């Protein structure tokens, strides 16, 4: 979840935050509840290094492929599936190394690197942020071997049509539950939150980043419920259909009239299938 208000930290979730409007790249679950165990069997936990330790979510879209956020780029990837309590030694899960990763070619990786660089200063921050476009925030991760499908590990089907504004959705992840935390503490047990799909026009009036047709916005007018730091790449499921992955949002998470922003999966189905077909 990329925080629009605290960009330099958003990927790793620690460090100083520049003054002014924020944008967060790693959403976390705020105002939700503990998911029923293994009720989200497609949910993946991605850990990696990128100067600091990173945590993201992901979605199993094929027995050997996990979809996550492009801004979760790093090294030494490990992916866990079938997990509920990430701190429990007794929780059975499957763990995999990543043999190859494929960020979406249209994602603005150069801008992301600038936002996370030591060279960023307040002046440059305000010059570059308004209207910045973080579309196509997706990355495909090829596992070293196929998963073993069971009650706790299942593939989530890709959508066949776009969701409608007003759809009832839910998101899930192990991200922080504190909307004001600058250190992004993460929860141990998988959290779920209910959200409502909002119009992109309404969303664009709330955020300084560009809202495109390849994005979805979900939240609540009154706020209080949101994804947040550590939830990036996790699923947004609307009316029972996989429609989005967590991308970015405001700081603090869960602000009124500031919905979280998600990648519209329907716009990227062909790319996802092409990656799987070409590299499997």
Swiss-Prot record:
Tissue: Salivary glands.
EC number from the UniProt entry: 3.4.21.-
Protein's name in the database: Blarinasin-2
Gene: KLK2
Stretch forming the signal peptide: 1-16
PROSITE patterns: TRYPSIN_DOM, TRYPSIN_HIS, TRYPSIN_SER
Pfam families listed in its UniProt record: Trypsin (PF00089)
Cellular compartment(s): Secreted
Source species of the chain: Blarina brevicauda (Northern short-tailed shrew)
């Amino acid at each position: 979840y990329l925080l629009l208000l605290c960009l330099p930290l958003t990927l790793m979730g620690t460090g100083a935050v520049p003054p002014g409007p924020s944008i967060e790249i790693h959403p976390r679950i705020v105002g939700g509840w503990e998911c029923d165990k293994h009720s989200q069997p497609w949910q993946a936990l991605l850990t990696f290094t990128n100067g600091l330790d990173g945590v993201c979510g992901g979605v199993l879209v094929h027995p050997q492929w996990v979809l996550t956020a492009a801004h979760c780029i790093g090294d030494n990837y490990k992916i866990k599936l079938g997990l509920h309590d990430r701190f429990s030694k007794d929780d059975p899960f499957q763990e995999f190394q990543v043999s190859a990763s494929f960020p979406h070619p249209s994602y603005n990786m150069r801008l992301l690197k600038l936002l996370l660089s030591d060279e960023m200063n307040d002046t440059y921050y305000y010059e570059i942020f308004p209207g910045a476009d973080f579309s196509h925030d997706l990355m495909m991760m090829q596992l070293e071997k196929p998963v073993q499908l069971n009650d706790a590990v299942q593939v989530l089907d890709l959508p066949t049509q776009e969701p409608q504004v007003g759809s009832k959705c839910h998101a899930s992840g192990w991200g922080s539950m504190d909307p004001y935390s600058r250190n992004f503490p993460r929860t141990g047990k998988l959290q779920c939150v209910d959200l409502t799909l909002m119009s992109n026009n309404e969303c664009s009036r709330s955020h300084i980043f560009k809202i495109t047709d390849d994005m979805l916005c979900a939240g609540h007018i009154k706020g209080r419920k949101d994804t947040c730091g550590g939830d990036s790449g996790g699923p947004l499921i609307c009316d029972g259909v996989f429609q989005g992955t967590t991308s970015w949002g405001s700081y603090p998470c869960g602000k009124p009239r500031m919905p979280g922003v998600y990648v519209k999966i329907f716009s990227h189905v062909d790319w996802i299938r092409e990656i799987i077909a070409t590299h499997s």
